[in-house]
Amino acid sequence: MTRQHRSIPLLLAFLLTATAAWAAIPLKTVTGTLDTIWGDSPDGDTYQRWFLTDDQGASIELMVEQLPPRGFAEWNRQRAEVTFEDDPLLSGPKRVRAVRLVDVGENNLRADGSAPISGSKPWVSILCKFSDIAAEPENLSFFQNMYGNNPGQLDHYWREVSYGAIDVVGSTAIAWVDLPRPQTGYIPTPGSGSNANLSLLFNECTAAADPFVDFSNGGSPFEGINMMFNGVLDCCAWGGSRFATLDGTSRSWRTTWEPPWGYRDAGVIAHEMGHGFGLPHSNNSDGDSNPYDSPWDVMSAAVAYSISDATYGRLGKHTVSYHKDRLDWIPANKIYTADSDGQHVVTVDDLAQATVSNYRMIKIPLGGNVLYTVEVRDRTGGYDGNVPGRAVIIHHVDPARAADAEVIDGDSPAANFADTEGVMWKVGETFEDSGNEITVRVDSSTADGFRVTVTRGSATDIFADGFESGNTSAWSDSQS
């Protein structure tokens, strides 16, 4: 007993000392631009890194432990005042204590944190060689033609996926240039880890290319920069954005860092460019840490169930309806929102079709920014030709998750990969969320999609007036 009593003041003394030490960590506040970058590994691992670049161009890597309610997009590419721990004895990312957005009125975020993208978005590929690696894995024409408008090339791809909302006309590539350092000068252990010095790679790759490219593009700056390296980086290919001043233009440049395996498959390039456009991962719903488990989205399993091209390898698929809506690629009159109690009978057409007569997606709000989405996928178009099948696909969306959209799987437990019958809702099948009193029933197949009934509220409330035996055609909603 005596020994136990002695341990209590000792423990309290330790806790007080630790608390005092934590409280004594110096804090620093810096104003600059926040950018996030995703790392994508072929082994299924993913990483997300945050950087704050101040007005003098100095970049600080941050440790972000909690995202805002609207998810990463609320901070990404935004000007902010960030307070972080600045312990001189510790190296590595700085732990964030507070973030306050500034110049909020100048950004184009919508209420859900998304940012519309439209028009021509030219990119430039800069090809950078480590000083100790002489190989040039592909020639200049390979990278220049990658941006073409033939099937399998990126201008054609982004036009189809966005329904013509964006293109990459004006994109180009410049010939291989030499970096001033060897591979290990940027990556401590090439091919492993997640600690490539992305800032140094960006700074020295763009500097090496600067004599040969005008990043300001004659007053119409390039939208993004694809950096193509001639050796592996760390674990990953990386995509996101990076604030910098290049040729007099200061902005968050949409940016990718690509090892050779990244540009051998155009689907990987499309995935990383998608991060550049502000898209996170989507996922299946098995609860593991691997976000590459959905073959329905280029932002998940980028090259699974993909079409192959003789030159550009495995191509990207379409992204999911929620992501297209985030970027404002689906017109409001092609989105049905089931936000009231009752039955909503809706005809939904295949998401990959260039034009549709009916709706492209259904939204079912759950409160806040959380919702279900309903879309139809089929083996159609130039890039969805090998998806697992023709079906209604339902996602649960929460922007506060790292992978915001998760495919609903009717099987329990959920499959490890979302290519099973459990995720493909077909005629006669019903998804039910009893807690929110929501059902989604697939009623029938149409020429271009499916007729779906969304029911909100309990059946007792819905049919309290006894009209269920009458004509319900007034509750239907389709377009002609």
Placement of each model-derived feature along the sequence:
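Bacterial N-terminal signal peptides
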Residues: 9-19
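Structural detector for short beta-strands of small beta-barrel domains
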Residues: 24-46
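Zn2+-dependent metallopeptidase catalytic core
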Residues: 69-79, 85-92, 100-270, 350, ...
